[in-house]
Amino acid sequence: MGLGEDSLWSISNFMENDALQSLHNASKKVYKPVTQLPPAYWPEDWKVTHYKEYTRFPSVTLPVSDTKAMIAQLTATRSSGRSFSRRGLTLEEIGNLLKYSCGEFTHSDGSVHRAHASAGARYPVEIYAIVRFSSSSDLLPGVYHYNVKEHTLEYLWSDTRTGVDPNTLVADQWALEASVMFVATAVFWRSQNKYADRSYRYICMEAGALIQNAYLYASDTDLQVVGYGGVNDDKVEQLLRLDTRLESVLCAFLVGK
């Protein structure tokens, strides 16, 4: 489907928007030397969870009742898993994870919605899968794009074809043990043509909602999921062959067993 005049204007407008470009580019820095300190060497402030309280004001105690609602159980057991074993995922495991994290659902009345919220239903977030270990002969290691409309993984190329060393994509050695690294990118103009500069917040909100869905789905399976911010954006964008004037890496989540 071709792009309309409004979309072409939005693309041009984003490419010329120095403020948004500068904000996104500044966030690409990964502070590896500091954040990779062993826990024993962490500053004390890193070990403390801070809360905001209005202790001089009256408060109302909120009840928490027992519930058998599935979502309550999933949120209570949600966790970040980092102990990967290089075991490959099945197509069914990947398919279900994507369907219930960011897939599309058609209702009996013909209406369509996705598993995650998106401001104005603009859906600027795209998902790519960098598969390292697979238990299916139908899923070769390499780079894929998730086609939401067809619920398929489109095989783009092997992860060595672009000349990018796969070991340089992440800042942490343990991240290389994950079966799949799912990369969330932003096609900025899709939201900007409706929400202008405010769109950057909405795009980040959408990516967060999507990854939380992945966490919740994994809570009911034997999969391990962890949101991962230590990606080397430039290397990943090179691997995905993105035109970074239009589409850039936001974040990633790792999945394995």
Regions found by a protein language model. Give the residues of each.
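Short pre-catalytic strand/loop immediately N-terminal to key active-site residues, enriched for Gly-Thr
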Residues: 197-206
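Structured binding elements
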Residues: 222
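N-terminal accessory segments that position/regulate proteins before the catalytic core
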Residues: 1-189, 194, 207, 226, ...
